[in-house]
Amino acid sequence: MTNIRKTHPLMKIVNNAFIDLPAPSNISSWWNLGSLLGVCLILQILTGLFLAMHYTSDTMTAFSSVTHICRDVNYGWIIRYMHANGASMFFICLFMHVGRGLYYGSYTFLETWNIGVILLFTVMATAFVGYVLPWGQMSFWGATVITNLLSAIPYIGTNLVEWIWGGFSVDKATLTRFFAFHFILPFIIAALAMVHLLFLHETGSNNPTGIPSDADKIPFHPYYTIKDILGALLLTLFLMLLVLFSPDLLGDPDNYTPANPLNTPPHIKPEWYFLFAYAILRSIPNKLGGVLALVSSILILILMPLLHTSKQRSMMFRPFSQCLFWILVADLLTLTWIGGQPVEYPFITIGQLASILYFLIILVLMPVTSTIENNLLKW
């Protein structure tokens, strides 16, 4: 009798994706991040569901409802902090996952890569609307400042902003629609993640060498299922350390003050995972230019396959490119630091230099270095 795992219409899909899937034998822990992102998404949907049971999306009661969750709901505080810090873990995994793709040349899987970039945008949108929901000072002013950037779009900008706000300022209509978006987007992310996997399984995984691994495959289960479970346990450990020992480490103290349209906080800044893009936005002293730079800083990932001039796929055997890659990582960390600093000397200059370096490395230095490496190898 044939195994039901291989014949049942539903079980067959699961089997081909997670059990009998032929996987390269040499993929490192950098390939764990995909499954960790899946774990993060499930965790966020579950904790978010329980939070939504007690949250009210009304300007008068939103802040109080979050306080009520933390004080009066059974284990509400842990659900709230797991959700808030779970977002941080999500972005840590996301940035490392993208970094892995850049380092090992995974962007040559065009469909998988492009859907990944769309996923990145969707997750960023979800996190942004989610940050507005507690209706603290930074929620309100963050929403005001970031949505206002759309007014830089010529001709339709102002109408577009007022359409998104549902009025002439960030108010009840804005909060209600942001809650609706925050609820629906994770399910769109889940659907996109399935398409992402579908395209990945058309080609099979890349591996650290960047060389086709068809000659040496192993089944996904038990080897990589065990490996993924270990990764998930470590992720949970780090998350719970954060939640139980310093839940407010990555948050902003201003968000413990209820939103007040009459009082602007001295430094308006987004959550830490948006600071690099915020620094690029602020480094250009022109509204439209800043917005274009902000969008380009993420959208530039779409160009990666076009900018790949090396004859090798992975950076594993390319020391000069490796050097550039880690300079890029350091540059992004610098931008993250600058994004959280006030707009004054010397931070403005450092931010501008780091922004120029970011685009210079990706658009010019990496393709040129790859060509030089080709010539050094007489290719």
Curated annotation (Swiss-Prot):
Main location: mitochondrion
GO biological process: mitochondrial electron transport, ubiquinol to cytochrome c
Gene Ontology MF term list: metal ion binding; ubiquinol-cytochrome-c reductase activity
Pfam families linked: Cytochrom_B_C, Cytochrome_B
Textual note on the cofactor: Binds 2 heme b groups non-covalently.
TM regions (residue ranges): 33-53, 77-98, 113-133, 178-198, 226-246, 288-308, 320-340, 347-367
Amino-acid positions noted as binding a ubiquinone in the UniProt annotation, renumbered to this chain: 201
Keywords tagged on the record: Electron transport, Heme, Iron, Membrane, Metal-binding, Mitochondrion, Mitochondrion inner membrane, Respiratory chain, Transmembrane, Transmembrane helix, Transport, Ubiquinone
Cofactors demanded by this protein: heme b
Residues reported in the UniProt entry to bind heme b b566: 97, 196
Subcellular location: Mitochondrion inner membrane
A GO CC term assigned to this protein in UniProt: respiratory chain complex III
Matches recorded under PANTHER family: CYTOCHROME B
Other comment: Heme 1 (or BL or b562) is low-potential and absorbs at about 562 nm, and heme 2 (or BH or b566) is high-potential and absorbs at about 566 nm.
The protein's assembly and partners: The cytochrome bc1 complex contains 11 subunits: 3 respiratory subunits (MT-CYB, CYC1 and UQCRFS1), 2 core proteins (UQCRC1 and UQCRC2) and 6 low-molecular weight proteins (UQCRH/QCR6, UQCRB/QCR7, UQCRQ/QCR8, UQCR10/QCR9, UQCR11/QCR10 and a cleavage product of UQCRFS1). This cytochrome bc1 complex then forms a dimer.
Family: Belongs to the cytochrome b family.
Chain's role: Component of the ubiquinol-cytochrome c reductase complex (complex III or cytochrome b-c1 complex) that is part of the mitochondrial respiratory chain. The b-c1 complex mediates electron transfer from ubiquinol to cytochrome c. Contributes to the generation of a proton gradient across the mitochondrial membrane that is then used for ATP synthesis.
The protein, known as: Cytochrome b
Organism of provenance: Alces alces alces (European moose)
